[in-house]
Amino acid sequence: MDLWQLLLTLALAGSSDAFSGSEPTAAILSRASWSLQSVNPGLKTNSSKEPKFTKCRSPERETFSCHWTDAVHHGSKSLGPIQLFYTRRNIQEWTQEWKECPDYVSAGENSCYFNSSFTSVWIPYCIKLTSNGDTVDGKCFSVDEIVQPDPPIALNWTLLNVSLTGIHADIQVRWEAPPNADIQKGWMVLEYELQYKEVNETKWKMMDPILSTSVPVYSLKVDKEYEVRVRSKRRNSGNYGEFSEVLYVTLPQMNQFTCEEDFYFPWLLIIIFGIFGLTVMLFVFLFSKQQRIKMLILPPVPVPKIKGIDPDLLKEGKLEEVNTILAIHDSYKPEFHSDDSWVEFIELDIDEPDEKNEGSDTDRLLSSDHQKSHSNLGVKDGDSGRTSCYEPDILETDFNANNIHEGTSEVAQPQRLKGEADLLCLDQKNQNKSPYHDACPAAQQSSVIQAEKNKPQPLPTDGAESTHQAAHIQLSNPSSLANIDFYAQVSDITPAGSVVLSPGQKNKAGMSQCDMHLEMVSLCQEDFIMDNAYFCEADAKKCIPVAPHIKVESHIEPSFNQEDIYITTESLTTTAGRPGTTEHIPGSEMPVPDYTSIHIVQSPQGLILNATALPLPGKEFLSSCGYVSTDQLNKIMP
């Protein structure tokens, strides 16, 4: 493809020689040459050994010059003299002919100089090189495109200041514009670029272009030699021209202590030594305070200590001695009055009270009370046997209708205890058939009648009458006392909160036992008044020492009903003293267990109560009135 283009160019050149006087032919040749170059810029009309244009420049935008290379001869063929032809590409004047270079000498060898008379700034130029009539190279350009100013002249520098350390200094570099550039009239506006470097360096440091002819250069090292040069170009167009002559700048030594190299503060060395010093101080501190730090990080395990007990006993595991010490000291004794929360209430089957109590002594004792309080039946007992002497603040409203009923209950409690003693005496009289016991019912009857006379009469309200009133009325009749059994079982609870007893095991005893019960009841009445169906162990002890112990000849095994039964204090006391006939020294005290804790719920109406622990021989008995466990009950029972 390149060969055919070359042949076409040669053909056009030959036709131009044949028609040298024809201007249109020359224009066609020039147009063809430039079209070939535009299609393939690397394409040259001549070989690489032929002359070609190197540059065209206008230093002041008024004149310009073009330069080319020398021709190289190859073989026997030699080129003729090189000629430059130019033409102005005026669109309106296509008839203008090609003209030869006006001056081959002023711009130097292998150059053509165009003075101001041949220079037109706004009209493009086309030039070509020919040898023996053949075009070897050509190009088109505008004068504004080839403006390259001459180098600035008269470079110098002045010292501005020196740093406090005497290591760096600032200078001011000045120069003058090219003498042929019309700067004063504004025909050209130039930009300047300054470059500097140390003498031994190869890379130049460039500064930003400026419009002025002076620029400061900062932070130059003292005792160093620098090279400075400047070049210029037309503002916003064109290329930079040649550099000016190199200006050498040498800064003298301002301080005799100034070193050749830069003085750098040894920050890294200071940081390393600082870290090392802090590490050493930290290790010294840890070594001196290691015991205290160890206690802070790993505190010692506290030694087991109990006030009044040797810690060695706990370490050696001597639990028996520890328990003995705990039993001696009052402050370590356990409390037995905690609530039994597993029993919430007792449900009573009182839908048909007449059928349940029909034909029994309880029916005869409480016949009048059931008629008056039948409308109040169906009440649930929420006490569950948990009330003790440690709970004196329980409201009386659960057992009485109003404050008047409270007075009635307080008076009725001693009468009830006395009535139970009378019942026991009557029962023994009927069994023994002894005339000696005939005086007991009379005394009992007189005491009951006297108690009823002294008892205040309450107002007639619902639930105000106690079941013991009916019991005392029945006791006043001598004919009915013979058939009354010993009441030791709870069969019902009235709406007012009183306990209804049922006949239990008969106790055979002599007349002295009857007198003992009467005297014990009278003494208990003098000391305190019982408010509840159960009483505290401390209160029971007040009654026990007065009663003398007698010799019991025979005992009958009490049979406990598995339904509707409460095991009371009297029944368990009788059972505990059953094995063998024993004689007691007069005046000795026999502790009576206090049954205030529910042990087993056998049926909706049957409960078995736990007794508090009796004092063992040689040990102090606990004075609290709390609930006791089954193990303590087993220790008391033989």
Swiss-Prot record:
Glycan attachment residues as annotated in the record: N46, N115, N156, N161, N200
Signal sequence extent: 1-18
Residues modified as Phosphoserine: S341
Modified residues (Phosphotyrosine): Y487, Y595
Matching InterPro entries: FN3_dom, FN3_sf, GHBP, Growth/epo_recpt_lig-bind, Ig-like_fold, Long_hematopoietin_rcpt_CS
Span of domain Fibronectin type-III: 151-254
Entry keyword annotation includes Mitochondrion: no
Region annotation Disordered: where it falls in the sequence: 353-388
Listed Basic and acidic residues bias regions: 356-372
Residues on Cytoplasmic side: 289-638
Positions of transmembrane segments: 265-288
Short sequence motif Box 1 motif: positions: 297-305
Record-annotated disulphide pairs: C56-C66, C101-C112, C126-C140
Biological processes per GO annotation: endocytosis
SUPFAM superfamilies given in the database record: Fibronectin type III
Extracellular-side segments: 19-264
Membrane topology of the entry: Single-pass type I membrane protein
Family from the record: Belongs to the type I cytokine receptor family. Type 1 subfamily.
Domain commentary: The WSXWS motif appears to be necessary for proper protein folding and thereby efficient intracellular transport and cell-surface receptor binding.
Name the UniProt record assigns to this protein: Growth hormone receptor
Record organism: Papio anubis
Encoding gene, per UniProt annotation: GHR
